[in-house]
Regions:
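Glycine-rich phosphate-binding loops of nucleotide-dependent enzymes
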Residues: 1-169
Length: 169
């Protein structure tokens, strides 16, 4: 969750702090190395905001952003940690179709340009099919299928579970 009373920039900087080398002593004494590191955090955060198309909101409070921009900010903060794997749990929930399309483009861009693996948990099947190389389908806590989007789209167990159609035995 976002920190609603912090700015967009501050929210991303929070994600970046896990990569800092200076500890409590550095925060208190503020040697040149700590100040240099803090400047780098700010610069890195601006770079991330530009990639997420959020730079226009840099000084805006997170709570004042449109819902789709808040979702992008959550992803921006996660990306600030320099992850190898980005876990997205229903990132399209509550988004309108236009915002979902923008999210689709953003996740593809992150996957391809930032070379981050994306683990997506999502009910929007159009988004899942668009983004995924491999899909694991779970129904009531049990894996019922796995495969490529094409294989999943035509899988009788998936069709039955999600569309309610009968499987011919």
């Amino acid at each position: 969750r976002l920190f609603p009373s912090m700015t967009v920039l501050e929210n991303v900087m929070v994600g970046r702090h896990c990569r800092l080398k200076s500890g409590i002593a550095g925060a208190i004494l503020r040697p040149p190395s700590t100040r240099k590191e803090e400047r780098k955090v700010v610069a890195d955060s601006y770079r991330i905001l530009e990639k997420m198309d959020l730079e226009k909101f840099v000084n805006e409070y997170a709570q004042n952003l449109p819902y789709g921009a808040q979702r992008r900010l959550e992803i921006a903060r996660a990306m600030a940690t320099d992850p190898f794997i980005l876990l997205l749990d229903e990132p399209a929930a509550g988004l309108n179709p236009s915002e979902t399309d923008e999210l689709d483009e953003l996740i593809l861009k992150l996957r391809d340009q930032e070379e981050v693996t994306v683990l997506l948990i999502e009910h929007d099947m159009k988004l899942v099919m668009s983004l995924s190389d491999r899909i694991f389908v779970v129904d009531y806590g049990k894996k019922i299928a796995q495969g490529t989007p094409k294989e999943i789209k035509n899988n009788p167990a998936v069709i039955k579970a999600y569309l309610g159609e009968e499987i011919d035995a």
